[in-house]
C-alpha cells in the first residue's frame, strides 16, 4: 500500500527515467530548424566535427542532443522518415546501457540508428546483433544509405565468410551480424595461430535486437566449437535396437506403480531414469547382444561409456519427438529451435544425443565431437564494454536482465495508444474440441474479411491445424521450420483481407504484418515498375487496408500457452501496431503440455465441478489465474537453470579468460625465449625434486631413476652416477646447477643448427599447440566433472564449492603439464637443418586447417546445471600482475595463472 502511494506521488523509476530523457528530446526538437538549414555537405561534416571533439576529450554522452538531431535530419533526407519523439527516447535508453521495451511496429530498426551512430563516433566499432542472417542483411542494407550519407562504414558478418571479408566487416564503424556468428568468431580468434588470423577488434558496444530471445531464451545453450572424436556409430545402432523392448513407467510419482515400467520420464527436468526392473532387463539384453559379458553390471567402472550410450538412446526415444524437437530432411536430423520454431542447420546436440536420435531415425550416424572451445551467450555479451538491447517484451524478464547482465529495463511509451482487444482464454477438456473451436473462429473471422494469424508451439501442431483447415476448405499459408525460405514474404502478406497464416512460435519475428498486405513487396516483385504501376498498387493497397481496419484489424489465435508469458505477449504483439485495431485470443485444452505438467489436476477438478459438457469451453478468472501461476512456475524454474548455468560457467570463464589472455599475449610477441628459459628452470627443478628431495641425505637419492627420466622425457644422456663417483665434492645444489646447465648447452647447440630466428618461431608454435591440446583435454575433463558433481550433495557437500575447488586443482595441474610438455617437446625434437623446422611448421598448419574444416559449431542442450553463486561482472578487465588471481586460489595473478605471461 505504502509503495503504491509513494509511486503515485513520485512516479515509478521508469517514469522518472523517461522524465529525465524528455528534457533531452526537447533540446533535440529545438535544434531541428537549425539542422534543416544545413546543406547536405554541412550535415555530413558534422560526423568529423563530433569525432574531433571526442578526440579532444568530450564524452560521447555530451553529444547526444546534437548527434541525434543530425541522424534525424539525415533520415528525413535519405529515407523521408522522421524519428518520432518516442524513438529518440528509445535511442537514449539504448545508449544508457539499458533494455528498451518497444512494442511491435514502433520502429526499433530506425531507433537503433541513433545509438549506433553515436557510439560509432569513438572509432571503436559497434556490433548490432540480430537473431538470424536474413534480419542482419536486411537491416544492414536498409540502414546503409543513412550511415554512408553520414560518412560511416557498414559491415555485415555472415556465417561462412572468408577471414579477410570478416576482418573488413569488423573493421567497419557499424557491423551487423547474428549472436551465434559473433560468439563463434570470438572462439575462433582464440584458437588462431597468428595475429593475422584474428578477425574481431576489442569488444566495445553491442546493440542486441530481440534481446530477450538472445540473452534469455538462448542463454542455456553454450556455443561450442568441436572437432571429431573416435567413431562409435556401431554401438549407437546396437543399443538403439534394445530400447523398444523397454516400457515407460506411467505414474512416476506413485509408489504403488514402482515396479511396472522399465524407465521413468521427468518431463520438467527433461531426464530419463532406469528403474530397478529396467536395469535388470537392459543388462540381460546387452548380454544377449554380446555387448556386455555375463555377470557384469552396467554401473561398473568399465561400462561408463556403455551407460552413456544407453542414457542417450533412452532420451532420444522418450524425450525427443520428430517434427517437434527435430525434423529429418535429406537423410539428416536437423534440430528445431524450441523458441523460434526455426531449423538450426549445422547445429548438433552434444553428449551423444544427436547420434542416438540419428540411430533412432535410421539415418547415417555422424561421429561424436570433442569440445575445442565453448562459451555461453551470458559470458560472451558481458565481455563488451557497453551492452544494450531492445525488444517488444522485456518487462516480464526485467529482474533477470538486472541480476545477470546488470541491465535495467525501461518501457518506452507507444507513439499512438494501443487499442487491441485481448480476449480472455477459452479452455476445453480435449485437444480435438479445442481445434474444432479454432476452426469455427477462423471461419467466422475470415467471412468478415478479417485476416487471422494462428500461433502454434511446434511444427507438429501447425500441421494438425493445417490439415483441419484444408478439410474445412479454408485457404491458408503455413510458416514453420520446414518452409522457412519464404518466411518474410509470407509474413509480409499475412495482413491481406481474410488471409489465414499459421506460424510456429515466433517464426517471422522482425518482419511487420501490414494491414492489407505489403505494397512494397508487390512493387519489389515487378521488374522495373513504372510510376503508374506503383500508384495503382498503392491505391489497391489503400482499399484493402481500409477494408481490414473496418473488419477489426489482425486477429491473433494462440493454440496453446507457451512456457513463458513473454512469448505469448510476443504473439499478441503482432497485432495492434501503431494504434491499429486488432484482437487476440488463446485457446487451451487440458491435454496441452503446460496444463498437463503444471496445472492439470486442479483445473480439471474445477472444470468437472462446473459441470462441463463435451465441446463446451470455460472462461473463468480462476482458470486464467491457475494458468498464469503455472507459467510463473516454469519461468522461475527456467531462470534458476540459467542462473545456475551461468554460475557454473563463471568458474570455467575465469579459467577461459586467463588462458585466452595468455594465448593472445603469446600470439602478439615474436620472442618467447625468456618464458621458455623461465619454465625450463621450473620443470627441471620439479623433475630433480622427484628423485633428489630437497635437503635430503645422499642415501635417499634415486640417481638411476633420474637418469632414465632425463633420457626418456628430455632426450638427455647424463652420466650423473659417474659424476658423483669422480667428484665427491659435488653436492645437491651444484648437481642441480650442472644438470640445468647441460640441458641449456644441448638446446643451444640445436639452436645453432637452425638459427635463432627459426628457433624462436618454433618455440612459439610448440607453446601454442601444447596449450591448445591441453586446454581441449581440460575442457573434456571439466565436462565430466560437471556431469557428476551434483552427487556430492548426497555427502552433505556444496556441489558448487566442490566444482570450484576441483576445477581449480585441475587447472593448476594443467598449467604444470603445459610447462612440462613444452620443455619435453622442445628437448626431444631432433633438428638438423632449418628446412626441418619449416616442414614441422607446415605440418602443424595443415593439421590446424584440417581441424578447422571438420569443426562443428553447436548449441549444447544444457539443462542440468547445479546451483552456484558468483557475482556477475560486466566487461573484460585486464588482470594486473599483483591482482588476486581470478581462479580463486588466493594467490597473486603473477604467481598463479600469470606465470606464463
Swiss-Prot record:
Q: What is known about its subunit structure?
A: Monomer and homodimer. Part of the essential Sec protein translocation apparatus which comprises SecA, SecYEG and auxiliary proteins SecDF-YajC and YidC.
Pfam families with a match to the protein in the record: P-loop_SecA, SEC-C, SecA_DEAD, SecA_PP_bind, SecA_SW
Q: Which residues are noted in the entry as Zn(2+)-binding?
A: 885, 887, 896-897
Q: Alphabetically, which GO biological process terms does the record hold?
A: intracellular protein transmembrane transport; protein import; protein targeting; protein transport by the Sec complex
Q: What does this protein's UniProt record list under function?
A: Part of the Sec protein translocase complex. Interacts with the SecYEG preprotein conducting channel. Has a central role in coupling the hydrolysis of ATP to the transfer of proteins into and across the cell membrane, serving both as a receptor for the preprotein-SecB complex and as an ATP-driven molecular motor driving the stepwise translocation of polypeptide chains across the membrane.
Name-wise, this protein is Protein translocase subunit SecA
Q: What is the lineage of its organism?
A: Bacteria, Pseudomonadati, Pseudomonadota, Gammaproteobacteria, Enterobacterales
User: What organism does the UniProt record list as the source?
Assistant: Salmonella typhimurium (strain LT2 / SGSC1412 / ATCC 700720)
Q: CDD domains given for it?
A: DEXDc_SecA, SF2_C_secA
Transferase recorded as keyword: no
The UniProt similarity line reads: Belongs to the SecA family.
Amino acid at each position: 500500500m505504502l509503495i503504491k502511494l509513494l509511486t503515485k506521488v513520485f512516479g515509478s523509476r521508469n517514469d522518472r527515467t523517461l522524465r529525465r530523457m524528455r528534457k533531452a528530446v526537447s533540446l533535440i526538437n529545438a535544434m531541428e530548424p537549425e539542422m534543416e538549414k544545413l546543406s547536405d555537405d554541412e550535415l555530413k561534416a558534422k560526423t568529423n566535427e563530433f569525432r574531433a571533439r571526442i578526440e579532444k576529450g568530450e564524452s560521447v554522452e555530451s553529444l547526444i542532443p546534437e548527434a541525434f538531431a543530425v541522424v534525424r535530419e539525415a533520415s528525413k533526407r535519405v529515407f523521408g522518415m522522421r524519428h518520432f519523439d518516442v524513438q529518440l527516447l528509445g535511442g537514449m535508453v539504448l545508449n544508457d546501457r539499458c533494455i528498451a521495451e518497444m512494442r511491435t511496429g514502433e520502429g526499433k530498426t530506425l531507433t537503433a540508428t541513433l545509438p549506433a551512430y553515436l557510439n560509432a563516433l569513438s572509432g571503436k566499432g559497434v556490433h548490432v546483433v540480430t537473431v538470424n542472417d536474413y534480419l542482419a542483411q536486411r537491416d544492414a542494407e536498409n540502414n546503409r544509405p543513412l550511415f554512408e550519407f553520414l560518412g560511416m562504414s557498414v559491415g555485415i558478418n555472415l556465417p561462412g565468410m572468408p577471414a579477410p571479408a570478416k576482418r573488413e566487416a569488423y573493421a567497419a564503424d557499424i557491423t551487423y551480424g547474428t549472436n551465434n556468428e559473433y560468439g563463434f568468431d570470438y572462439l575462433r580468434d582464440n584458437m588462431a595461430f597468428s595475429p593475422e588470423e584474428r578477425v574481431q577488434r576489442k569488444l566495445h558496444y553491442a546493440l542486441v535486437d530481440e534481446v530477450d530471445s538472445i540473452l534469455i531464451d538462448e542463454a542455456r545453450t553454450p556455443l561450442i566449437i568441436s572437432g571429431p572424436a573416435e567413431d562409435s556409430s556401431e554401438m549407437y545402432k546396437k543399443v538403439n535396437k534394445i530400447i523398444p523392448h523397454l516400457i515407460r513407467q506411467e505414474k512416476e510419482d506413485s509408489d504403488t506403480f514402482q515396479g511396472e515400467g522399465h524407465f521413468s520420464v521427468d518431463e520438467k527436468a527433461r531426464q530419463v531414469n532406469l528403474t530397478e526392473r529396467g536395469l535388470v532387463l537392459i543388462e540381460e539384453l546387452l548380454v544377449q547382444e554380446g555387448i556386455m559379458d555375463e555377470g557384469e553390471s552396467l554401473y561398473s567402472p568399465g561400462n561408463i561409456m556403455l551407460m552413456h550410450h544407453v542414457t542417450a538412446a533412452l532420451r532420444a526415444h522418450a524425450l525427443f519427438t520428430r517434427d517437434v524437437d527435430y525434423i529429418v530432411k535429406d537423410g539428416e536430423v536437423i534440430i528445431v529451435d524450441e523458441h523460434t520454431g526455426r531449423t538450426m542447420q549445422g547445429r548438433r546436440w552434444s553428449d551423444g544425443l544427436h547420434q542416438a536420435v540419428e540411430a533412432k531415425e535410421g539415418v547415417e550416424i555422424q561421429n561424436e565431437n570433442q569440445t575445442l572451445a565453448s562459451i555461453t551467450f551470458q559470458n560472451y555479451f558481458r565481455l563488451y564494454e557497453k551492452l544494450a538491447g531492445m525488444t517488444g517484451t522485456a518487462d516480464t524478464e526485467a529482474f533477470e536482465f538486472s541480476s545477470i547482465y546488470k541491465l535495467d529495463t525501461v518501457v518506452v511509451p507507444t507513439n499512438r495508444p494501443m487499442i487491441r482487444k485481448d480476449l480472455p482464454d477459452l479452455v476445453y477438456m480435449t485437444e480435438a474440441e479445442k481445434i474444432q473451436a479454432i476452426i469455427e473462429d477462423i471461419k467466422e473471422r475470415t467471412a468478415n474479411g478479417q485476416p487471422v494469424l494462428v500461433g502454434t508451439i511446434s511444427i507438429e501442431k501447425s500441421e494438425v491445424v493445417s490439415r483441419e483447415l484444408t478439410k474445412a476448405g479454408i485457404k491458408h499459408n503455413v510458416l514453420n521450420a520446414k518452409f522457412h525460405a519464404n518466411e518474410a514474404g509470407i509474413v509480409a502478406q499475412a495482413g491481406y483481407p481474410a488471409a489465414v497464416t499459421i506460424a510456429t512460435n515466433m517464426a517471422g519475428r522482425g518482419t511487420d504484418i501490414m494491414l492489407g498486405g505489403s505494397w512494397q513487396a508487390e512493387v519489389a516483385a515487378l521488374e522495373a515498375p513504372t510510376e503508374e504501376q506503383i500508384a495503382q498498387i498503392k491505391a489497391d493497397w489503400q482499399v484493402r487496408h481500409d477494408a481490414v481496419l473496418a473488419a477489426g484489424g489482425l486477429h491473433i489465435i494462440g493454440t496453446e500457452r507457451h512456457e513463458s508469458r513473454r512469448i505469448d505477449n510476443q504473439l499478441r504483439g503482432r497485432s495492434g501496431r501503431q494504434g491499429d485495431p486488432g484482437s487476440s485470443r488463446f485457446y487451451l485444452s487440458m491435454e496441452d503440455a503446460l496444463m498437463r505438467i503444471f496445472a492439470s489436476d486442479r483445473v480439471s477438478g474445477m472444470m468437472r465441478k462446473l459441470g462441463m459438457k463435451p465441446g463446451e469451453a470455460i472462461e473463468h478468472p480462476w482458470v486464467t489465474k491457475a494458468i498464469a501461476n503455472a507459467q510463473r512456475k516454469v519461468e522461475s524454474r527456467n531462470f534458476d537453470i540459467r542462473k545456475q548455468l551461468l554460475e557454473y560457467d563463471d568458474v570455467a570463464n575465469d579459467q577461459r579468460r586467463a588462458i585466452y589472455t595468455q594465448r593472445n599475449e603469446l600470439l602478439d610477441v615474436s620472442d618467447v625465449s625468456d618464458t621458455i628459459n623461465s619454465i625450463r628452470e621450473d620443470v627441471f627443478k620439479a623433475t630433480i625434486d622427484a628423485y633428489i628431495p630437497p635437503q635430503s641425505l645422499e642415501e635417499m637419492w634415486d640417481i638411476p631413476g633420474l637418469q632414465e627420466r632425463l633420457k626418456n622425457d628430455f632426450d638427455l644422456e647424463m652420466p650423473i652416477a659417474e659424476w658423483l663417483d669422480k667428484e665427491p665434492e659435488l653436492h645437491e645444489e651444484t648437481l642441480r646447477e650442472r644438470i640445468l646447465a647441460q640441458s641449456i648447452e644441448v638446446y643451444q647447440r640445436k639452436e645453432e643448427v637452425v638459427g635463432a630466428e627459426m628457433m624462436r618461431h618454433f618455440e612459439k608454435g610448440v607453446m601454442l599447440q601444447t596449450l591448445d591440446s591441453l586446454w581441449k583435454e581440460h575442457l573434456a575433463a571439466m565436462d565430466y566433472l560437471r556431469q557428476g558433481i551434483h552427487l556430492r550433495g548426497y555427502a552433505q557437500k556444496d556441489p558448487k564449492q566442490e566444482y570450484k575447488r576441483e576445477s581449480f586443482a585441475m587447472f593448476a595441474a594443467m598449467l604444470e603439464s603445459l610447462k612440462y610438455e613444452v620443455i619435453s617437446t622442445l628437448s626431444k625434437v631432433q633438428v638438423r637443418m632449418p628446412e626441418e623446422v619449416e616442414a614441422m611448421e607446415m605440418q602443424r598448419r595443415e593439421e590446424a586447417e584440417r581441424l578447422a574444416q571438420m569443426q562443428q559449431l553447436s548449441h549444447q542442450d544444457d539443462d542440468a546445471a547445479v546451483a552456484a553463486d558468483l557475482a556477475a561482472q560486466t566487461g573484460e578487465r585486464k588482470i594486473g600482475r599483483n591482482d588476486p588471481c581470478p581462479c580463486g586460489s588466493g594467490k597473486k595473478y603473477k604467481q598463479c595463472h600469470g606465470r606464463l605471461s
